[in-house]
Design a protein with these regions (language model features):
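N-terminal secretory signal peptides that target proteins for export/translocation
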Residues: 1-3
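Sec-dependent N-terminal signal peptides
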Residues: 6-15
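C-terminal motif of bacterial Sec signal peptides marking the signal peptidase cleavage site
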Residues: 18-19
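An acidic, Gly/Ser/Thr/Pro-rich helix-cap/linker signature
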Residues: 22-145
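Extracytoplasmic and endomembrane cell-envelope/extracellular-matrix remodeling and assembly machinery
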Residues: 82-132, 143, 188-191, 195-215, ...
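Short, surface-exposed glycine/acidic/tryptophan-bearing loops
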Residues: 108, 112, 164-185
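Alpha-helical scaffolds flanking conserved acidic
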Residues: 147-154, 171, 219-224
Length: 359
């Protein structure tokens, strides 16, 4: 009996010792696993946090899109059907009354009015671009004592697209054909086409319109001549023995031309009245630039100009669409620069010129 107790005691001690050893071994084996689990948990938390951040950004974008679509939908709902818009009872253009009491005249204007109103995207673009280009045109019209309504000629000519080119070869915002452009000082060769220089073309267009008015004594006839050419209008006046644009038989494009200008004025004078709404941030930025005049004996690389004044080459090219090559050609030229960069330009230009002279 005593031996059995002794054996039992020994077995108990052995069990306890082996158990402690196993516990130590288990703890040793568990510690790396715990570290691995903690590391994996940390990585999962970071991944989840990154995923949450991505989802939050997506939600933010979706919210912005929802706000935009809701606003767009409200605008569509707010716009009455096209048939509800009516022409004003009286319409003038450059101070000249359009004879709407004549049903044929009213019908012609009404047709252009409806066609324009149906071109929702086009009118929005008119509004956006007008903020960019109209201020300069309005300023020059006022300085030249010309009717403010002449700015709408540029809308009808090109929708204020500076790179516009027609099938007949007319170019720029004011759509000059080569011969008329040259007559009003716009040079054209393989290195430049100044019909695309908005500022220079504006000077030419306003001078041309004034010249046409001086000849025909009517702004509507002057506009018609701007479209069809003064020779054509002279011939039609002589042949038809009539001097009123609205009662002359003219080419279809010219017959519609002045009506389109009048419609542009009607809509852009009060776009909200016809269901067109834009917030201030939706408009294109006004034209802001500095214009320098330079005399060149060697072509001036535009890339060098861009680097010197701290802008991209593309920006310089877009500001000077009349320059068709990579350099400003030899001769006297105007160069458009981003606002606030002319001082840096002159430092570069004078240094560049001295280097050339030293060679």
């Amino acid at each position: 009996m005593k031996n059995l107790k002794t054996i039992g005691f020994v077995l108990l001690i052995s069990f306890l010792v082996s158990g402690c050893a196993m516990d130590r071994s288990f703890r040793k084996e568990s510690e790396p696993q715990k570290i691995i689990i903690e590391r994996e948990s940390s990585e999962k938390v970071e991944a989840l946090a990154e995923r949450v951040k991505t989802l939050e950004e997506s939600v933010s974008k979706l919210r912005s899109e929802i706000v935009f679509l809701e606003k767009h939908f409200r605008n569509i709902q707010a716009r009455p059907p096209l048939s509800s818009y009516k022409l004003p009872k009286e319409v003038t253009l450059c101070g000249e009354k359009i004879p709407l009491e004549d049903r044929n005249v009213w019908e012609n204007l009404d047709r252009e009015f409806i066609v324009a109103l149906d071109s929702h995207a086009q009118i929005l673009l008119w509004m956006k671009r007008a903020r960019r280009y109209f201020p300069h045109i309005e300023k020059r019209l006022k300085e030249m004592n010309l009717p403010d309504d002449l700015k709408y000629v540029a809308i009808t000519e090109s929708s204020l697209r500076p790179h516009a080119v027609s099938s007949s070869g007319a170019a720029g915002v004011w759509q000059f054909i080569p011969s008329t452009g040259e007559k009003y000082g716009m040079r054209r060769n393989k290195t430049l086409d100044e019909r695309f220089d908005f500022l220079k073309a504006t000077e030419g267009a306003l001078a041309y319109l004034k010249s046409l008015y001086d000849e025909f004594g009517s702004w509507t006839l002057a506009m018609a001549a701007y479209n069809a050419g003064e020779n054509r209008i002279r011939r039609e006046i002589e042949f038809q023995k009539a001097k009123d644009y609205f009662y002359l038989d003219l080419p279809m494009e010219t017959e519609r031309y002045v009506y389109k200008i009048a419609v542009a004025k009607i809509i852009l004078s009060d776009p909200g009245k016809y269901g067109f709404y834009l917030e201030d941030r939706d408009f294109y930025d006004p034209l802001q630039l500095e214009r320098v005049q330079i005399e060149l004996k060697q072509p001036l690389p535009l890339l060098g100009v861009a680097r010197a004044i701290g802008c991209y080459y593309k920006e310089i090219k877009e500001m000077n669409p009349h320059l068709t090559e990579e350099s400003v050609p030899v001769g006297s030229h105007f160069l458009n620069l981003p606002q606030g960069t002319s001082e840096r330009f002159w430092i570069f230009f004078n240094h560049w010129r001295k280097e050339l002279e030293g060679k």
